Amino acid sequence: MIRGLFVGRFQPVHKGHIKALEFVFSQVDEVIIGIGSAQASHTLKNPFTTGERMEMLIRALEEAGFDKRYYLIPLPDINFNAIWVPYVESMVPRFHVVFTGNSLVAQLFKERGYKVVVQPMFKKDILSATEIRRRMIAGEPWEDLVPKSVVEYIKEIKGVERLRNLATNLESSEKELQAPIRVPEY
């Protein structure tokens, strides 16, 4: 049995992730889906918790008709590239091939002797979690870029409101940082 590894942050899960996973599932018997930056949430770059991202993946994979040939594994960041692959190896079941669109991830796994497949990227200019988060904050249409089940879930957890609050709080903090320092007069 061949098991593949696919790592992403999924902030949020979008149709590009699902298309990539379709390709991955066509190549292997089982897939380990590593949820990167698992420790991060409630920031503009990582607004959703690991549990929320897992729920998005479960719903989106079910909606897409995937069977249960996958494992969802949280992967907190360690910010130390030289030991990242052994760290991942210690956190997930054994795997044989790595699927990625990230050149650094590809290099790190190749250096450890893994077969690496660069999976096709789909409309990466708009099927990007960064672009989707930007649209959510700006009040622009984003729903057609993510699976319907993920749209419903983001609405359930008030994810757009969370992102907008984070953006508003950041703007306020930046304004405070840019304000001139006033020395009290005595």
UniProtKB/Swiss-Prot annotation:
The keyword Transcription regulation does not apply. Pathway: Cofactor biosynthesis; NAD(+) biosynthesis; NAD(+) from nicotinamide D-ribonucleotide: step 1/1. GO terms for cellular component: cytoplasm. Its EC number is 2.7.7.1. SUPFAM superfamilies: Nucleotidylyl transferase. Keywords: ATP-binding, Cytoplasm, NAD, Nucleotide-binding, Nucleotidyltransferase, Pyridine nucleotide biosynthesis, Transferase. It is found in: Cytoplasm. It comes from the Archaea. Its main location: cytoplasm. It is an enzyme of class 2 (transferase). GO terms for molecular function: ATP binding; nicotinamide-nucleotide adenylyltransferase activity. Gene3D superfamilies: HUPs. InterPro entries: Cyt_trans-like, NMN_Atrans_arc, Rossmann-like_a/b/a_fold. It catalyses: beta-nicotinamide D-ribonucleotide + ATP + H(+) = diphosphate + NAD(+). One of its GO terms (biological process) is NAD biosynthetic process. The keyword Cell division does not apply. Belongs to the archaeal NMN adenylyltransferase family. NCBIfam families: arch_NMN_Atrans (TIGR01527), cyt_tran_rel (TIGR00125), PRK01153.1 (NF002243). This is Nicotinamide-nucleotide adenylyltransferase. It comes from Pyrococcus horikoshii (strain ATCC 700860 / DSM 12428 / JCM 9974 / NBRC 100139 / OT-3). The lineage of its organism: Archaea, Methanobacteriati, Methanobacteriota, Thermococci, Thermococcales.
